[in-house]
Every structure is written in structure tokens, then in C-alpha cells.
Amino acid sequence: MPPQLRLNAVAFVSPQNHPILIRTFVQGPDELKYHYIAHTSLDVIDERSASEPPLTAAMSSKSTECYMNLLYTMEDVAVYGYMTPLKVKIIIALALTDAVVRDADVLTIFKALHTVYRQSVANPFLRLSAPIDGYNDNAALLAAGSPKWKAFRRRVDDIGKAVGAVAVTA
């Protein structure tokens, strides 16, 4: 990946639009700003996914179909979106630069983040202790801040460092 990319934040959002994990990689009091960016990105993602025709089974296997491109820019941040086939939304905020950001580089970041999430959820030893009430809300996934999700957060932090994040906030 080119060194000019700098990842400022990553957000994982459930299909019901509940934040699973919002991780910031900038120093300072900008954490609330990235929560705002994640929530406003949901409106753009919902609008784009509602306007697109439903995918056929043959087309839905492509990871590029999950990539939602540049959602918007705000101040010094470019926001990109990705929606998994199970409707989990991954949002990244990259620092704006004068350099060209290639879609292939952004898609590589999303594939890595999606793989980390998929591996964490598929861990058979991760007991989420969610009540079985028939409701299809992934409420147990909202506990990503709990110690059970330490490996998930660590892997997301590793991706942030590999992309070029400055520092990791707790």
C-alpha cells in the first residue's frame, strides 16, 4: 500500500445500525467527531443500498459489489464505505491528501478489515452469552468493547498501523 494513506478511524456497524466498534487512530479529542462521521455515513450507505437493484446470486459473490466507494468528504477526512453480504457496515476515514487514493488500495483495507471481523465472529471459543429470544438483532456483537473482543481490537489496530495510522487511542 502506498505510504500516503493514513487511516484516521474504523467503524463496524451492525445490520440494525448499532455501532459494534469505532476505533480512532488520531491523537486528540477527535473521538466524538469519528462517531459522528460513522453515524452520518449510515445515511449515505442506506441511501445507496436502497437505490441499487438487488444482486443476483452470481453477482453477490464479488467483493467489489460490497464496496460503496467514497461516501463523502468532511473537513480533512475522506469517508469510504463497505457493506458485507450480511449487512454489517464497515466505514473508514482516511486523512485527505493531495495524492490520488486508488480504489484498489481502499478495497484491500476493507478486505483485511472484513476478514478480521469474520474471523472474530467465527471463533468457536468466543462465548457471546446472548439471550436466545428469536429476535434477529446481533446484540451480543455490540459488546466489542468487552475483554472478549481483545483479539478483534488488536487486529483492527494492526491494520491501522499497517495502513499508516499515527497512534492508537484506548
Question: Which sequence ranges carry the predicted segments?
Answer:
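Short, acidic, Ser/Thr-enriched surface-loop or helix-capping motifs
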Residues: 14
